[in-house]
């Protein structure tokens, strides 16, 4: 199958997708009513899109093309308002978090959508288990070769993005001991983790053609790499973040990725090499398991450094780019988060340690998303 030409888009423009949990009070398990909400809110939208994801307990909010994080925040805030209003009318709740802490995957209903039904046929129960919730950020690129360079550059910071956004410590009623357990769900998929090595867009087109020979790949959307190019949009899409508990944190993560993209494409601080990925999965695991307390290992020197310290260094490097893009507030907020030493997974564990229940935790998450 031939790959679409890379659509030229304005560099550093943004698109944000948030996969939200649809909750059924008072038990606060996942609901199977996303279709009801989507039908209710679609006529009210003036920008962005609200749509299905894999199962009926998932609802995706997606912005249009945004020039900066302020425009993205305005679109998401408007969508949040209409979704919360419709959810209240249907006696449902909405919340963030990378996993629901006690849902049973066997109960999840795959959406009546041709693509998702085909995916269910290919992957079986793995698709129901993939009822987890992530944030995806698209960044615009001028051409395909820039997109491949940006993908490799951003891959250096996958552990940092995971650690800052980690919000999935509980699954199936148990503490997983991971800060981000969500990404483990995808480990059985054949396209899990980093994209196979290519050095330019022409090589990527050849890779896609060979992948399509498997008959499991009909489009880029069927590839679930941590970071992937999206030629139809003219973007690179970062897919490793848990859905945050607040809209503010989602915007901060998008601002970081936008600023990092600007720094990478203007400064070109790396010359991508295949060996860059030698310890990729080990460093990714450290971020998933330990969050900001994880330890990164340099594939070339063997040097080890705390993820928190390296994240502060990243934030310093991208600060000038953030100022140019109007994203400096995001960098300031994330710097404060790192210095305080926490993420949302840590907050969740503190809630339980203080005597809270998992049901109470989901209730609290719904209240947080509703601004209560």
Curated annotation (Swiss-Prot):
- Entry keyword set: ATP-binding, Ligase, Nucleotide-binding
Q: Which SUPFAM superfamilies match?
A: Glutamine synthetase/guanido kinase (SSF55931)
Enzyme class of the recorded protein, top EC level: ligase
Q: ATP-binding among the record's keywords?
A: yes
Q: Name one GO molecular function term.
A: glutamate-cysteine ligase activity
Which parts form a coiled-coil structure per UniProt? none
Task: Tell me one GO biological process term.
Answer: modified amino acid biosynthetic process
User: What EC numbers are recorded for this enzyme?
Assistant: 6.3.2.2
The catalytic activity, as recorded, is: L-cysteine + L-glutamate + ATP = gamma-L-glutamyl-L-cysteine + ADP + phosphate + H(+)
Among the Pfam families in the record, one is: GCS2
Quaternary structure, from the entry? Homodimer.
What family does this chain come from, according to its entry? Answer: Belongs to the glutamate--cysteine ligase type 2 family. YbdK subfamily.
- HAMAP family hit by this protein: Glu_cys_ligase_2
State the protein's purpose.
ATP-dependent carboxylate-amine ligase which exhibits weak glutamate--cysteine ligase activity.
What's the protein called, per UniProt? Putative glutamate--cysteine ligase 2
Origin organism lineage: Bacteria, Pseudomonadati, Pseudomonadota, Gammaproteobacteria, Enterobacterales
